Amino acid sequence: MSRLVVVSNRIAPPDNKGGAGGLAVGVLGALKAAGGLWFGWSGETGNEDEPLKKVTKGNITWASFNLSEQDYEDYYCQFSNAVLWPAFHYRLDLVQFQRPAWEGYMRVNALLADKLLPLIKENDIIWVHDYHLLPFASELRKRGVNNRIGFFLHIPFPTPEIFNALPPHDELLEQLCDFDLLGFQTENDRLAFLDSLSSQTRVTTRSGKQHIAWGKDFQTEVYPIGIEPDEIALQAAGPLPTKLAQLKAELKNVKNIFSVERLDYSKGLPERFLAYEALLENYPQHRGKIRYTQIAPTSRGEVQAYQDIRHQLETEAGRINGKYGQLGWTPLYYLNQHFDRKLLMKIFRYSDVGLVTPLRDGMNLVAKEFVAAQDPANPGVLVLSQFAGAANELTSALIVNPYDRDDVAAALNRALTMPLAERISRHAEMLDVIVKNDINRWQERFIHDLKEVTPRSPERQQQNNVATFPKLA
């Protein structure tokens, strides 16, 4: 039986007792089924030459390493998060490309390949995750690794007009073709990748999703990531903590709109605040009868763009409360702090509306978690951005354009006044999708498809030596 090797930028600690997110839950499920290794950065800076830190529990080994301060800055802070993250979320205006950062990104991917190489066994299958590791398969191939290597991109893949603006776009595209299987959250992401590729070289496609470019053959497929709906329902049900129970009692005559997102410019938080203001302005009958709570814990607080959005939200919250607030009623609560995941699921359950309106998002698991946390007999309503990957599955949500504040305000009004029968029907349809496409289904489909790939060999390469030339200008 093939062993599974998972490679990601960060690894979940083996002693993590709870609060695991989508990637960790899916990866651990796959590793428990096949046995294997989870390899990644420890999250700490230090001496890169130190031996790998290894912990084994059952049939899973965790292997982690430190990064030097310089590599952490170049690979993680600069290229991954100041170039790839904004570009892949359609924010070229925030891209800060620096050649030394690109060189550091490549250097760290090569370093990781060197560290992983001695741990790879002949029949291992390798599953690589996310934008930090786009060149990783290429580095392994240079070192003679012919194992099956799959890649899953958790964030959006931008259109060619965006992606090809990145100075190393051609190198990144060719490196991605060294994976055997490329997985994306949505069909739009998959097609955007192929469009970018076709703009740089001739791509031969056979059997729909099998392709050859630069003499390398690979497959593309869509694997929308899921959640653990049963676990979330369990966390959401049951008695409330004392303070939350008191708050719910105090707000029994107030309808609650609730959002929780990482503080990130891709999440559309300023636009969300303005849409809520439009609701209060356009539908004054709701004033004094609703409350919008936005939880947005700080993320990458050292980056200027994130500092700017935090200050903007603080200013907007104060302005909206000053304009519309009344004695005994504060319309908007903005909390820039972290809350326990289990507590959030309980808050979801007593919320009347879940407001999830990112400007661009690979999937957005918060939307799925909100649905899973609801009481099926009296569910809340999900208002969801058309630019979240989840909108492709949760079609019974109220789908909105987050750039149109009046559209979002109208959807909020509809959600607040929706009859119970319609709420139950919409929730049941979304929950059915979430249960069918849960986190285990996601990892099982990917691993199954990766196992079906024929491992690389000289014979396979000879079959792929077809005419794939760079396109002429």
Spans of model-derived segments:
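Catalytic cores of carbohydrate-active enzymes across secretory and cytosolic contexts
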Residues: 1-473
